[in-house]
Amino acid sequence: MAGLPRRIIKETQRLLAEPVPGIKAEPDESNARYFHVVIAGPQDSPFEGGTFKLELFLPEEYPMAAPKVRFMTKIYHPNVDKLGRICLDILKDKWSPALQIRTVLLSIQALLSAPNPDDPLANDVAEQWKTNEAQAIETARAWTRLYAMNNI
């Protein structure tokens, strides 16, 4: 971790010492700005029982710039596109240096519990979510079984 800003070292140490329930985030052995993240599908959500792999990268400008985060596991969600990019305000225009890696991961976990089809990244999924929520939830469950179980 030599050469890393103290803030990143402190945040990493805290993530490892006090993990967030349902979230595992470990820095890559060769690049401490790159994290391997696993988020458990929240209880009572269509993603329950799934484990979702994400990658999180801290740019040089961090904490002045938001981390780059994307899903590596396929997920049927109105706020995640086919490339795994996430539509979340704090990853874009609502980012503040006061926020931390931990906050970002908790926000992504919350997004799994409460998809927001009114601010979509995947328009087709959002449309399905708005016109036939029961069917969208069933598809999300099916994708969770297909892509997010037994994948770790």
UniProtKB/Swiss-Prot annotation:
Cross-link (Glycyl lysine isopeptide (Lys-Gly) (interchain with G-Cter in ISG15)): K92
All residue ranges annotated as the UBC core domain in the record: 3-149
GO MF annotation terms: ATP binding; RNA binding; ubiquitin binding; ubiquitin conjugating enzyme activity; ubiquitin protein ligase binding; ubiquitin-protein transferase activator activity; ubiquitin-protein transferase activity
Pathway: Protein modification; protein ubiquitination
UniProt catalytic activity: S-ubiquitinyl-[E1 ubiquitin-activating enzyme]-L-cysteine + [E2 ubiquitin-conjugating enzyme]-L-cysteine = [E1 ubiquitin-activating enzyme]-L-cysteine + S-ubiquitinyl-[E2 ubiquitin-conjugating enzyme]-L-cysteine
Enzyme nomenclature, EC number: 2.3.2.23
Regulation: Activity is inhibited by binding to OTUB1, which prevents 'Lys-63'-linked polyubiquitination. Activity is inhibited by GPS2, leading to prevent 'Lys-63'-linked polyubiquitination.
Segment forming the signal sequence: none
Predominant location: nucleus
The entry's keywords: Acetylation, ATP-binding, Cytoplasm, Disulfide bond, DNA damage, DNA repair, Isopeptide bond, Nucleotide-binding, Nucleus, Transferase, Ubl conjugation, Ubl conjugation pathway
Posttranslational modification: Conjugation to ISG15 impairs formation of the thioester bond with ubiquitin but not interaction with UBE2V2.
GO terms, biological process: antiviral innate immune response; DNA double-strand break processing; double-strand break repair via homologous recombination; negative regulation of TORC1 signaling; positive regulation of canonical NF-kappaB signal transduction; positive regulation of DNA repair; positive regulation of double-strand break repair; positive regulation of intracellular signal transduction
Gene Ontology, cellular component aspect: cytoplasm; cytosol; extracellular exosome; nucleoplasm; nucleus; protein-containing complex; UBC13-MMS2 complex; ubiquitin conjugating enzyme complex
Domain of life, source organism: Eukaryota
Effect on the protein upon substituting K92R: No ISGylation
InterPro entries: UBQ-conjugat_E2_core (IPR000608), UBQ-conjugating_AS (IPR023313), UBQ-conjugating_enzyme/RWD (IPR016135)
Role summary: The UBE2V1-UBE2N and UBE2V2-UBE2N heterodimers catalyze the synthesis of non-canonical 'Lys-63'-linked polyubiquitin chains. This type of polyubiquitination does not lead to protein degradation by the proteasome. Mediates transcriptional activation of target genes. Plays a role in the control of progress through the cell cycle and differentiation. Plays a role in the error-free DNA repair pathway and contributes to the survival of cells after DNA damage.
Protein name (database record): Ubiquitin-conjugating enzyme E2 N
